[in-house]
Amino acid sequence: MAAALIDLNGCINPALQKKQAEKALEEKYGESFQITNYNGVAFGDDYYTVNAYAEAHPEIPFLAAVDLKSGVVSDPYVTKRLCGRISDKVIGNIAAIKDDIYVFTEAVLDSTLLTDPDISFEDYMQEMPETKFYIHIFINHQTSTKKELANELLKVANGFYKLNGSLCLYTGTEEQINNVREYAESNNELYHEFQTMTDDLYIGTYKIVNGKVLLTEYELTEMAGDRL
């Protein structure tokens, strides 16, 4: 496989590597993928990277790394699909919040060799027990009291006993939150731009330990002040 990726002059052939990446992803998942960018091989690395998305899920762009020798691909597609399901569950858990919210979830150490995008949270954690999740919640605060919010936010990780990580809380206008949504849903990862966009919206970060959010009304009040 590797030899075919080098042209007659001994140079790496980007076009062939893009095709190899697309084929590797399709064989791994049984889905069709589009490669949007070839990033090449960084100095000293034994793999190259591409930007890609599944045709069935263009809203989930990701970065895939393909081993130069074996052609094996490692990527966060399974993790990102799982994060989407976690976000949906969180929205249901805190549905009693009266204000409009936006939730998205990201994972640390998200790139895997796992092949089932529909894997359950429990099975995922058996395979990737060190994974920690960041659940970002943006609130367009209008009517909810701090007590109501604190009570509901305690339910964020209900149903995810082994979930560890953090709840990151923000508040903003509808326009600000929509801007964040567009950014989060169009980038492989959160970069410096995300920090800049959310600096003025950020309220605080609260630990999640084995599915329990460590948050009190007092802590929420102290961090949020009069912004909630």
What is the predicted function of each stretch?
Residues 188-210, 228:
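Long C-terminal interaction/binding lobes of large macromolecular proteins
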Residues 32-66:
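Exposed beta-strand-loop-beta-strand "reactive/processing" segments of non-cytosolic proteins
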Residues 1-11:
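Sec-dependent N-terminal signal peptides of Gram-positive bacterial secreted proteins and lipoproteins
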Residues 64-76:
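Charge-dense, low-complexity polyampholytic segments
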